[in-house]
From Swiss-Prot:
Name of the protein in question: Small ribosomal subunit protein uS11c
GO molecular function terms listed in the Swiss-Prot or TrEMBL record: rRNA binding; structural constituent of ribosome
Family statement: Belongs to the universal ribosomal protein uS11 family.
Organism: Aethionema cordifolium
Gene: rps11
Cross-referenced InterPro entries: Ribosomal_uS11, Ribosomal_uS11_bac-type, Ribosomal_uS11_CS, Ribosomal_uS11_sf
Compositionally biased intervals (Basic residues): 9-23
Disulfide bridge partners, by residue number: none
One GO CC term, this protein: ribonucleoprotein complex
Amino acid sequence: MAKPILRIGSRKNTRSGSRKNVRRIPKGVIHVQASFNNTIVTVTDVRGRVISWSSAGTCGFKGTRRGTPFAAQTAAGNAIRAVVDQGIQRAEVRIKGPGLGRDAALRAIRRSGILLSFVRDVTPMPHNGCRPPKKRRV
């Protein structure tokens, strides 16, 4: 028969509460990826470590409503609300993708009160790379 393993030490000494490390971040990078189907907003520090993120799907929008400008505005607001509590003051914005939520997400970021050092469009453009998908016939 196997003997039960006894645990040595008490639980009173361990720290209770959240394990999450709350960092003070003065400057960050806000990445907005706007596709036709969804908008994903990720806030990172300058080294690229993710601090907070949100998308239209996690904000409760499902189906075709995820691609709307209002869903992108809500996602940007949710992602930024978490990092404002951590003390972010300055940020740079990198927008990627052709979606409808580009401008709405940028408007929500501007309204949040964070100083934007610059806004950069980093949409990947092919130098005649892969063949695009065929045109839709509706």
